[in-house]
Amino acid sequence: MAGDNPENKDASMLDVSDAASNTTINGKHSADSTNEASLAYTFSQMNVDNPNELEPQHPLRHKSSLIFNDDDDDEIPPYSNHAENGSGETFDSDDDIDASSSSSIDSNEGDIHDADMTGNTLQKMDYQPSQQPDSLQNQGFQQQQEQQQGTVEGKKGRAMMFPVDITWQQGGNKVYVTGSFTGWRKMIGLVPVPGQPGLMHVKLQLPPGTHRFRFIVDNELRFSDYLPTATDQMGNFVNYMEVSAPPDWGNEPQQHLAEKKANHVDDSKLSKRPMSARSRIALEIEKEPDDMGDGYTRFHDETPAKPNLEYTQDIPAVFTDPNVMEQYYLTLDQQQNNHQNMAWLTPPQLPPHLENVILNSYSNAQTDNTSGALPIPNHVILNHLATSSIKHNTLCVASIVRYKQKYVTQILYTPLQ
């Protein structure tokens, strides 16, 4: 290689050979600063991208090349593939370029290249926070919309509540109230009324309906003698109250329904979610006029208006008019004399649901079941006294109670003298 013309020799091969010979003579490795500088300068002057420089040129396989394109804002390459020193290129182990020599480049052009790459990386990293995916924007809009809906529903729930003042005036130091409005699980403390000793009260927001409650006075369950009382299923005395809505409260649901419909249309316009074709057609149909042309109009299903019913205190004429009462009794006399089938004029002695006593009815299942179980009783005879027909000079008296899905019948047999 030394005998060839220096002009025809490849510059890269000459520099590499000289660097290798100098390393052999001096007994040193690639740590020599002079050889590293010349080797770095040689590689920096080589244009490996131009196919006219080196013939024949073998294509180099790059695993990944970092390319920054400011026009492409949708996709940002992951920063995990970037090198901290800003080189920005990784080569395959099968490439002809030595990785150790490429990492030792410290020339001015290498520094400029590193600075440019670092600047581009910082520019791209600074641009990243301003670029937000559409999914994050949609998620933020959905959360804001849900908060608005929760606020509207909370206002609606508060609009259905009415203030109720519960008072206690029968002494005690610590007074609490619990009831059906708290599920009988929480106690609400009463506060004394200023200027009125011995009087304690609490103001609650309750929905319309019947509410039962009891007081806890100094760790003792009590009920107030100044409030309406009733008994629960266990026979304990409780207080109750009826919370009724104002007369003009019935018109509010219609107004709220109209406002909800208008808000729903506005929300559909503001929503950025993709709508299906059927939904878009439905919205367009609602905006179109009812007159479709050629004598056709759009049909709207409307609920019929309820008739206005009023409660009266008028007594029927059969109880006040003597002529009507006389005619009624004459009809009864004719029925008794002629034995005609006019049973509709005579009221029954017992309601129809009480005529069939459970003690007198026998189920077909009793032929197979010898346990003596009775059929499921009617709900109207629960907690009532029932009697059976007299059989064998014995009278049966029974009482039926229910516990969840079980019925217990207690029967007492009394002999007749």
UniProtKB/Swiss-Prot annotation:
Residues 19-37, 118-136 have a biased composition (Polar residues). Residues 152-342 are annotated as: Kinase-interacting sequence (KIS). One of its GO terms (biological process) is invasive growth in response to glucose limitation. GO terms for molecular function: enzyme-substrate adaptor activity; protein kinase binding. The keyword Cytoplasm applies. InterPro entries: AMPK1_CBM, ASC_dom, ASC_dom_sf, CRP1_MDG1_kinase, Ig-like_fold, Ig_E-set. SMART domains: AMPKBI. One of its GO terms (cellular component) is nuclear envelope lumen. Residues 343-417 are annotated as: Association with SNF1 kinase complex (ASC) domain. The modification Phosphoserine is found at residues 12, 21, 44, 135, 276, 279. Residues 1-37, 64-155, 250-269 are annotated as: Disordered. Phosphorylated by SNF1 in vitro. The keyword Oxidoreductase does not apply. Residues 1-12, 257-269 have a biased composition (Basic and acidic residues). Keywords: Cytoplasm, Nucleus, Phosphoprotein. It is found in: Cytoplasm; Nucleus. Component of the SNF1 kinase complex, a heterotrimeric complex composed of the catalytic alpha subunit SNF1, one of the three related beta subunits SIP1, SIP2 or GAL83, and the regulatory gamma subunit SNF4. The beta subunit serves as a bridge between the catalytic and the regulatory subunit. Interacts (via KIS domain) with SNF1. Interacts (via ASC domain) with SNF4. Interacts with REE1. Beta subunit of the SNF1 kinase complex, which is required for transcriptional, metabolic, and developmental adaptations in response to glucose limitation. Has a structural role, mediating heterotrimer formation, and a regulatory role, defining carbon source-regulated subcellular location and substrate specificity of the SNF1 kinase complex. Promotes the relocalization of the SNF1 kinase complex to the nucleus upon shift to nonfermentable carbon sources. Present with 3590 molecules/cell in log phase SD medium. Belongs to the 5'-AMP-activated protein kinase beta subunit family. PANTHER family: 5'-AMP-ACTIVATED PROTEIN KINASE , BETA SUBUNIT (PTHR10343), 5'-AMP-ACTIVATED PROTEIN KINASE SUBUNIT BETA-1 (PTHR10343:SF84). This is SNF1 protein kinase subunit beta-3. The lineage of its organism: Eukaryota, Fungi, Dikarya, Ascomycota, Saccharomycotina. The gene is GAL83.
